[in-house]
């Protein structure tokens, strides 16, 4: 065993006085001194439990002792009588065994592969032990869940990721998916439950037993987000529901996750075999699947973006050449060829590497280097985490922990360890890049083209000197370009740019200037790009991105030239530069029905319990998607209707995620309202009004929302901190508003306006469905019924959605006096015009002035409220374009008039989108859109001016 280094020997002297009673420096073995000096976790544990230290000193941990874990745990749980004592024993057992593993790992008593195996078996033992105890307890309370034939149904648990692969790290969380075989009911209990209810309750208790922090700590952080539909899906699914999901909706990234999926516990029964057989075709295709390569390229981009986004410079998992890249390399071959090559279907990485070598899919030397690098990195990761039982992969900055890791990795000192680490990660990165490929470097022609601009940039040439390269520009533009360059250089002198940053900037600027100054609008484009560059000059990684990826630089120039809004966004949030790397996604926004899934995948990389990171991730996702929508808009690949569709679907995905987060936080604090025990869903709905309700969001639109619940009076929550059920929903809505409006370094998510709720700002933030119906029928003004025309549920369970739709339909199909309605709608419009109309007589406000968008909206709303009692089909849609279509189809409006209003409406909205991209207000010269305005005004007079 390597003797302790000098810094660690000195640190040992500070430990001696903290040793448990009965232990002295002379009574301890060299091994004990080494472990207790290395790991604060082990030291704190044996101080609390001195008998563990005596046990370890008398008999060292063995390589195969994982075989005894199940028996040891069974003994520990023999006297458990309730959930609280179960939680205590699970935590006690986990800590005791983790100390044994830390001891064996620190002293290299067993090899590193065995350590991974022991960590994984420990987690599996605790999961299965807790499940089995709780299953029996739930059966005593509610009966045994059975299928219609009376066959008992088990809870099957899929361990995902490193747990499934038998490669768990020291302080890992665990990713699980719960399933049960067949529908039915419980039998033999005090009350019958549907199987779905039984297994949901069992799953909730199991997560609590493992995950909830107590005075004894926790067992594992449990992450359930890999299940179908993530947090918005059921906690536990039947086999049939799982099969439907993976056949119909399973995504590529879910295939990757399922490669490592493994059933926990004794899993050779008929149900387990059925589940494995069902999942196998989804994961491994029968043919050689080269379609996966593009998805893997996207994954590679995600890795790079995450490293930049989180500043993971010294991260041995996510950094370049880290553990994630080795896993990625192996998965490439598993997913492309695994269906044809059974040897590639292993859940574990090292056996799969052996199969890759045997199949000659990678050179033998590459495989050998990957294996050595993987074991080196995994040992370093585990040692790092075992210091404080902390989930981290970032190398320490303090001398003590650096000395610990150098000693644990058998290096002479920290620089030697860093050198070895750098070599291993460089080998991994080389194979990684060769497998997927990077952008092509600059061609000699591009280098030659940029050379004159090197002088302009580095030598600060005067106007006369630079005339040849700027000859195509007008005199004023040429002077402006040179002034911008000179001002930018002066600005740089005020910034603390290091040598590396200056070097990269000097490499980048000639190429950037060559591209920008070849344009006729060079001065305008450069004026938009230099603020962005000034913002990132101290963040070398972004300069390197633009320097090393010429394609990204070209897209940056094109987008900034086209839109100051995009330039401003990129300057404010430089992490968006990552989106420029892949033109395939930059100009092709996410499919309208895929935003929720993309966001779910994005959020999986963020710890569920880290609220700050969750808030940042939501905002960053929205900004990236907005950039892609705007880029497609500028490129002309999205018409105005589709721009709004994408912006609306994006907003709905954000609402879904925010409600999920708020719900999770509230339930963790208070439990859920007890009436939900008897029904599916959450008894909560979010209704979108205005542009959101009408599928007409713009780039900077706020969200008009109201919140509904269906909680009866006198219902309490079922958590340890009980509160009134209606108070729960009020706090939930307040939490949702907070998550939307909190300003982080990435800004706010959306401005939210909830004043359209019953009684406006004076009313309760969240309303019961019954109270909402009563208000609409007896108290609401006509303008509130107009608003209801453009309202729809954007988040909610089917039961509440149906209730809202019924109320909306009832209100809209109520017979009204035509003259009274006409007068009230017209007077409301006149009030709005007086309040919001354009104050500049020489300008036309596209939205608020006569003949503008609001007039078209009022015409549509008036006609729905006027005629829906005769033509109920008019209530079907909430957007103006389809309402106009319905009016024509139902004989209310002439088809030619409806079509003309639709064209006018989309034309005006298109102009608003483009003004937003130019960061211009929503008004134009009075001479613009005269044809459209005249048409709208004629229609207004026809329908809303009293005859």
UniProtKB/Swiss-Prot annotation:
Function: Involved in the regulation of glutamine synthetase GlnA, a key enzyme in the process to assimilate ammonia. When cellular nitrogen levels are high, the C-terminal adenylyl transferase (AT) inactivates GlnA by covalent transfer of an adenylyl group from ATP to specific tyrosine residue of GlnA, thus reducing its activity. Conversely, when nitrogen levels are low, the N-terminal adenylyl removase (AR) activates GlnA by removing the adenylyl group by phosphorolysis, increasing its activity.
HAMAP family from the UniProt entry: GlnE
Name under which the protein is recorded: Bifunctional glutamine synthetase adenylyltransferase/adenylyl-removing enzyme
Key words, A-Z: ATP-binding, Magnesium, Multifunctional enzyme, Nucleotide-binding, Nucleotidyltransferase, Transferase
UniProt-annotated stretches for the region Adenylyl transferase: 450-947
Similarity field: Belongs to the GlnE family.
Organism: Salmonella enteritidis PT4 (strain P125109)
Gene symbol of the encoding locus: glnE
Entry keyword annotation includes Nucleotidyltransferase: yes
Catalytic activity: [glutamine synthetase]-O(4)-(5'-adenylyl)-L-tyrosine + phosphate = [glutamine synthetase]-L-tyrosine + ADP; [glutamine synthetase]-L-tyrosine + ATP = [glutamine synthetase]-O(4)-(5'-adenylyl)-L-tyrosine + diphosphate
Domain of life: Bacteria
Keyword Isomerase in record: no
Cofactor(s) named in the record: Mg(2+)
GO MF entries: [glutamate-ammonia-ligase] adenylyltransferase activity; [glutamine synthetase]-adenylyl-L-tyrosine phosphorylase activity; ATP binding; magnesium ion binding
Pfam family, one: GlnD_UR_UTase
EC number(s) per entry: 2.7.7.89, 2.7.7.42
Region (Adenylyl removase): 1-440
